[in-house]
Design a protein with these regions (language model features):
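Gly/Ser-rich helix-loop-strand patches that form or flank binding pockets
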Residues: 91-131
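Small/aliphatic-rich secondary-structure junction motif
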Residues: 2-47
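Mid-chain, well-packed structural core segment of small domains
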Residues: 58-97
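Short, well-ordered secondary-structure micro-motifs
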Residues: 16-17, 45-49, 79-82, 105-106
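Charged helix-capping and loop-helix junction motifs
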Residues: 20, 50-54, 108-116
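Short, structured coil segments at secondary-structure junctions
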Residues: 30, 63-65, 123-125
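General small-molecule cofactor/ligand-binding pocket signal
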Residues: 35-37, 68-72, 129-131
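Short, surface-exposed acidic-centric catalytic microdomains
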Residues: 42-59
């Protein structure tokens, strides 16, 4: 079964809604399951639950079929996203252009010319869609 993972902010920002809309469309076209992921950063001191995330998404998009809501806790958004993608064997990762910029900055510490899509493709065998 194909799996699409989409990281979003909570509460949903305008960019998160656009990224999520694209992920919902991709999942429908590929007859795929969808994992909506929020990374709850320890340093922000919030305690977002899966129920909170689900309510926020359903308020914007209505009830979605074949969706799993995931809240990971961590210090680095990028690391938590990578963990989710690796653990689930996601086929497609849909990220917003702002998130892609953060990934580039994180990868710049490791690589000379960070190409987020190529980095993820090589290491995860996933398609990366930037919205």
């Amino acid at each position: 079964m194909t799996l699409v993972v989409v990281p979003v902010r909570y509460p949903l920002s305008r960019h998160s809604r656009a990224t999520l809309a694209e992920a919902v469309d991709i999942a429908a076209k590929r007859d795929a399951d969808l994992a909506v992921l929020h990374v709850d950063l320890y340093q922000e001191g919030r305690d977002v639950s899966r129920a909170d995330l689900k309510r926020a998404v359903e308020r914007e998009f209505g009830r979605l079929d074949r969706v799993r809501y995931v809240v990971r806790r961590g210090f680095l958004v990028e690391e938590a996203i990578l963990e989710e993608v690796v653990e689930t064997g996601a086929d497609v990762v849909v990220i917003g252009h702002k998130q892609a910029g953060r990934w580039r900055r994180a990868l710049r510490r490791i690589l000379d010319e960070p190409d987020v899509e190529a980095f993820l493709r090589e290491r995860l065998d996933s398609t990366v869609v930037t919205v």
